[in-house]
């Protein structure tokens, strides 16, 4: 399924070049994120409290609990997290880059958006998504054991990876998939009917839900969800053969999560899902076959430019303090 034809070989030099630029970006990003060069990001003070042991870590993921048994120096822990995150990304791209245009788009998105949203600000989520890059690849080539191992590693770095445990059977088992559609329909009806208030309260106040939920609302349709839908449509149209089915089921699973969390007023988790699945759709574009169409690439570039504007100018991801 992965592109290995003779026509591809001539582009290896181009891929090598863009990969070198990406490595340079990783190195610079690693330094900037570790030093908080532009000032402390909006989440940095929270991480100081968590990793210094000032805030209770009862629901903190296993990886960080382990690190805190060794040290409670927040700078050391953040350094380890970022080292792992950057190394995993570099290793993945070194092993599985097959599509020059997909790799280029990934590079642009990372340099303009993901570096700042994830590695500069959301350290834990950034490490989790880096590991999930391998998960979607193993899902794509139908390697169940490797898929579950990588997902468990991702869960150990961020609870938002928990739903990925059901992704493999959703993609490869029609019975599980139809059961998933049924459960999703029930949850949607429950939320729309207003009968799910007690269930929402339970989620928000039980364990992990204390972190992923809050009282704010979230609009199901917004600029970020629309950009994700548009990106999927373009990617789906430009994909070839079995890649279409894989991409469709992967995106469908993400949509069901996003809709569920949105309807049950869990905005933190809903936007985590948007960030995660958009990043992973770009990751998939690195190793699948796609039709060469400059119009598709142009529209994808417009989406990336909008996201750059949104995160930096509207959302203010580098909303630094002292």
Predicted regions and their residues:
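Membrane-interface transmembrane helices that cradle and orient dolichyl/undecaprenyl
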Residues: 132-146
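Transmembrane-helix signature of polytopic, membrane-embedded enzymes
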Residues: 93-113
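Start-transfer (signal-anchor) and selected internal transmembrane alpha helices
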Residues: 1-28
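Juxtamembrane segments of multi-pass membrane glycosylation machinery
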Residues: 66-81
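Transmembrane-helix motifs of polytopic, lipid-linked glycan transferases
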Residues: 80-99
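Short acidic/glycine- and proline-prone juxtamembrane loop motifs at membrane-interface regions
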Residues: 120-126
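Transmembrane helices and adjacent periplasmic/lumenal helix-loop junctions
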Residues: 151-167
């Amino acid at each position: 399924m992965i592109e290995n034809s003779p026509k591809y070989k001539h582009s290896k030099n181009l891929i090598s070049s863009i990969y070198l630029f990406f490595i340079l970006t990783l190195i610079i990003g690693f330094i900037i994120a570790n030093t908080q060069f532009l000032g402390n990001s909006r989440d940095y003070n929270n991480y100081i409290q968590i990793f210094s042991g000032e805030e209770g870590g009862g629901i903190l993921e296993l990886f960080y609990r382990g690190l805190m048994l060794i040290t409670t120096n927040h700078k050391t822990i953040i350094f380890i997290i970022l080292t792992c995150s950057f190394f995993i990304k570099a290793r993945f791209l070194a092993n599985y880059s097959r599509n020059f245009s997909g790799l280029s788009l990934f590079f642009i998105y990372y340099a303009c958006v993901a570096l700042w949203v994830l590695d500069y600000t959301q350290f834990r989520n950034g490490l989790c998504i880096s590991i999930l890059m391998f998960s979607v690849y193993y899902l794509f080539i139908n390697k169940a054991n490797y898929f579950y191992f990588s997902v468990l590693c991702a869960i150990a770095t961020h609870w938002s990876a928990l739903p990925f445990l059901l992704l493999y059977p959703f993609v490869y088992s029609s019975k599980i998939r139809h059961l998933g559609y049924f459960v999703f329909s029930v949850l949607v009806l429950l939320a729309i009917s207003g009968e799910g208030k007690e269930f929402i309260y339970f989620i928000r106040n039980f364990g992990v839900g204390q972190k992923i939920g809050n009282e704010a609302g979230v609009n199901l349709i917004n600029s970020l969800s629309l950009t994700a839908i548009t990106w999927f449509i373009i990617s789906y149209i430009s994909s070839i053969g079995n890649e279409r089915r894989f991409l469709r089921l992967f995106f469908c699973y993400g949509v069901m999560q996003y809709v569920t969390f949105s309807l049950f007023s869990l905005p933190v988790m809903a936007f985590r899902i948007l960030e995660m699945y958009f990043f992973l759709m770009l990751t998939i574009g690195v190793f699948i076959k796609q039709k060469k169409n400059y119009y598709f690439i142009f529209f994808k570039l417009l989406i990336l430019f909008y996201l750059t504007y949104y995160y930096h100018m509207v959302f203010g991801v580098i909303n630094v303090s002292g």
